[in-house]
Amino acid sequence: MEYTFAQYQESAQALRDRLGAFRPRCLLILGSGLGSLGNEVESPIAVPYEDVPHMKRSTAPDHAGRFVFGRLAGQDVAVMQGRLHTYEGWSFEDVSYPVRVLRLLGAETLVVTNAAGAVNTAFSAGDIMLITDHIKLFGVSPFAAPIWRSSAPGSRT
């Protein structure tokens, strides 16, 4: 599905209405095994994905399917407890939709976590890895989206 800028704005406004003056500076997308980190957020405001217009729902097992807004480690954050996946039938634009909406709310930093395997024998279970690149074997890029000016989702201007 191709979303319009008005749809992104409508989603962002629905979140503003729930959050009052709170604005997250960082979006944390929690992957498998880390969903409980959302329970550590101070002064949490939980918003189920189904309460956000145009947002798809996570159907993966053990994914709560909600945002948690508040403070974590002294930072104003939005936490996604349960991400969206293409294997659930969602498009790349569906999967990246919440990132663009949160950018409209003011999030400037994105941290994505996941459970991953490695072929490097120097790695041990529980090691932290920094992803610096990716291999895209699909025909469509998850970065593909309409280009908008100014503070629009994904804009660098």
Ranges and model annotations:
Residues M1-T157:
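Metabolite-binding pocket within alpha/beta catalytic cores that recognizes anionic/polar moieties
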